[in-house]
């Protein structure tokens, strides 16, 4: 849904999502990012330890290689709206964002109390707390100038999977009431709004029809695995109008040796050969790569598993289409001398999506970008672990950004009886030093610089040879 004051032109783009995948869920719209945007993703542990923001940036790195922008993870584990507001100036505004996404609600609504006898009263209490705390956040956000606000309704708590019986009944129902508060605020203030909850519930329950123990939301019912985060990225990018944008659309007629369509690419040196067709193509984008390896603490699934719940994912967000008519028989397709596949003329005349072939030179280039972006994510995680220590423990104790010996003594004191905090001793000892933080920031900047050097598409030679 669009609530931005200047977005009326986009109203006509609202479409009903495919009912088989997202039943009873209306498509929503967010303005695409622009060159030079600085985007901060504000949230709790789902943002903090998750990948959705990294995957969104990876899409922009590969699909818009000439449009450099910057994104930052501003999540802190365990935060409610109250803690987000407390760290907001130091953690978020200090990054000078031009776009700010804001999500909360998982921690605000409570947990085990939903299984107590007075769960209804507890739910009302937590909703009222969330309303009051979010109202303060709303006033803060309203006071900011020059920042585009995007309210994001949180990913769900999985209260339907049967993989165990440890379920906080109706917790997600209360989370949806919190999301309604965000939607109302978006309407009041002309902010953009995207609900992740209902579409992800729909995706989850679709799989649970055949496998009741399935969960997209993670083994703790709270934190989506990598495939769940890629589903979040899909919903976000879909809302930005990226679904259906071509990596390249190459259409040629081999009989005439002519290009019939070239979308988001430039085709040249078309040459009919005795047994097929040869041409060069320079695409404006790279494929959107899907990682098959799990990343992040406690995660078990690679992002590529998103295709189980969104089978059209690759065609929707990474369509590098090749269509060639006027051929007969079976043909070998090679790119830069690398054999890609043997294809029938009928298949080629219908068209193929080259993004489904991970060994093409252009997909391999995209995988390099992905690997560098993952390295950047890992460095950024050090800052988010430090943020948890700094804002949730040191700041309340009066030692925000304090690298004095007195602060170190307070940290050691706070670690007593808190095993989670004690496990971050190494993080504290490193990140409390501004020189160390500066070095890691330079490392991330270097990685991003390198990404925007290596993500530039290259011209490739395509050869179709009859077998």
What role is predicted for each listed range?
Residues 1-30:
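Bacterial Sec-dependent N-terminal signal peptides
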Residues 8, 33, 54-70, 79, ...:
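Alpha-helical cap/lid subdomain in secreted, periplasmic
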Residues 28-39:
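Membrane/wall-proximal cationic-aromatic binding patches
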Residues 37-51, 77-80:
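Catalytic nucleophile-elbow at a beta strand-turn-alpha helix junction centered on a G-D-S/GDSL motif
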């Amino acid at each position: 849904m669009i609530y931005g004051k200047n977005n009326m032109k986009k109203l006509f783009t609202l479409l009903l999502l495919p009912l088989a995948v997202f039943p009873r869920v209306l498509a929503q719209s967010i303005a695409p990012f622009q060159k030079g945007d600085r985007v901060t993703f504000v949230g709790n542990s789902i943002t903090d330890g998750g990948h959705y923001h990294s995957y969104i940036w990876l899409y922009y790195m590969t699909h818009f290689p000439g449009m450099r922008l910057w994104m930052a993870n501003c999540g802190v584990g365990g935060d409610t709206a109250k803690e987000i507001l407390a760290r907001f100036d130091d953690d978020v505004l200090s990054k000078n964002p031009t776009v700010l996404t804001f999500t909360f609600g998982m921690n605000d609504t409570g947990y085990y109390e939903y299984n107590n006898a007075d769960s209804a009263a507890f739910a009302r209490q937590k909703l009222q707390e969330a309303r009051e705390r979010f109202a303060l956040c709303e006033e803060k956000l309203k006071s900011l100038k020059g920042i585009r606000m995007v309210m994001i309704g949180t990913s769900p708590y999985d209260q339907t999977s049967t993989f165990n019986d440890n379920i906080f009944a109706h917790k997600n129902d209360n989370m949806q009431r919190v999301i309604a508060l965000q939607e109302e605020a978006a309407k009041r203030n002309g902010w953009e709004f995207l609900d992740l909850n209902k579409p992800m519930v729909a995706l989850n329950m679709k799989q649970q029809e055949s496998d009741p123990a399935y969960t997209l939301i993670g083994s703790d019912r709270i934190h989506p695995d990598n495939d769940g985060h890629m589903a979040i990225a899909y919903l976000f990018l879909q809302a930005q109008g990226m679904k259906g944008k071509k990596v390249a659309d190459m259409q040629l007629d081999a009989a005439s040796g002519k290009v019939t369509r070239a979308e988001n690419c430039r085709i040249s040196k078309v040459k009919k050969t005795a047994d097929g067709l040869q041409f060069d193509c320079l695409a404006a984008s790279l494929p959107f790569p899907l990682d098959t390896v799990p990343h992040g603490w406690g995660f078990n699934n690679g992002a590529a598993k998103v295709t189980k719940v969104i089978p059209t994912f690759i065609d929707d967000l990474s369509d590098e289409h090749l269509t060639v008519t006027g051929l007969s028989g079976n043909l070998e397709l090679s790119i830069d001398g690398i054999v890609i596949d043997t294809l029938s003329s009928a298949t080629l005349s219908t068209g193929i999506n080259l993004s489904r072939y991970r060994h093409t030179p252009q997909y391999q280039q995209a995988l390099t970008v992905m690997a560098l972006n993952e390295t950047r994510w890992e460095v950024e995680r050090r800052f988010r672990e430090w943020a948890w220590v700094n804002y949730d423990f040191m700041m309340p104790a009066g030692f925000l950004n304090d690298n004095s010996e007195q602060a170190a003594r307070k940290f050691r004191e706070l670690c007593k009886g808190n095993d989670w905090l004690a496990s971050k001793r190494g993080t504290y000892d490193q990140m409390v030093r501004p020189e160390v933080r500066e070095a890691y920031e330079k490392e991330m900047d270097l990685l991003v610089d390198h990404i925007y050097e290596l993500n530039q598409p290259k011209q490739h030679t395509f050869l179709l040879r009859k077998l």
